Amino acid sequence: MKTLLQLAAITFLIASTATHAQITNPDNLVAPPPANPAQHHALPTADNLQWLWQYTKPTPIGRASDLRVDARFQAILSQDFKQPQAMWGATEAREPLATVIPLFLSEHGTITAEQNRYITIDGCVPSFCPAHGLLWIDLGTAHPLAVFAAVNWTPENHTTEESTANYNLWLFPNRTLDPNILPLALTTSLAHWDARLAEAHRLVPHIAQAVLIEPDGTPQPLDPAQAGANTIAPQPDTTTPHDSTTN
């Protein structure tokens, strides 16, 4: 009798673990009915980010503009990204990172899903696409890993219309990462980002410097190649009008 009870307990634990680890298939996702705008969403937790999948439809670009105005999205940013940022705004009046992220995803925004596990949201600053960003989220873990990648022009020697201009890359993870062993899926996504920009005849930057900003604000220098940068030859933007002096 004791053995039967032990087997039953083990079977229950295995079934519970499998259910918890399952990731919702975005192809089978049914979007919920529109919420009452007067109601505030509760702060999302690590286990309830499956609602993000709905914004990856329709493919191939999803609905980035709708995501940016979803209160749950801003709640995620405020909760997960508290690092100081130095890539945008005057030194004495820099906005919080959680406020800057949507700005870097505003224009030409797309949302894509990969391997039924990863979501990437990318875009650029309106009227100044030399400043652009990508938010990468791994939903395949109990506590999703999110990394915001920001690129901005280094205003020295070359204008943004020149392929020889240099850019900086910042990576902001929502939890501590080893700068020497970044997730392969993340660096692959960053490399694919440049490939998509090249295909769209938009700016492909030459990353001169890269840095990982830990959740506590500690900067960790990175080799740009180690972060997945510079896999595509740099090219100027030939499709998006912008002011090369903006920052």
Label each PLM-derived region with a short phrase.
Residues 17-21:
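Sec/Tat signal peptide C-region and signal peptidase I cleavage site
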Residues 22-247:
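Exposed acidic/polar residues on beta-strands and adjacent loops within beta-sheet cores, strongest
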Residues 1-5:
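Positively charged n-region of N-terminal signal peptides that target proteins for export
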Residues 7-16:
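Bacterial N-terminal signal peptides
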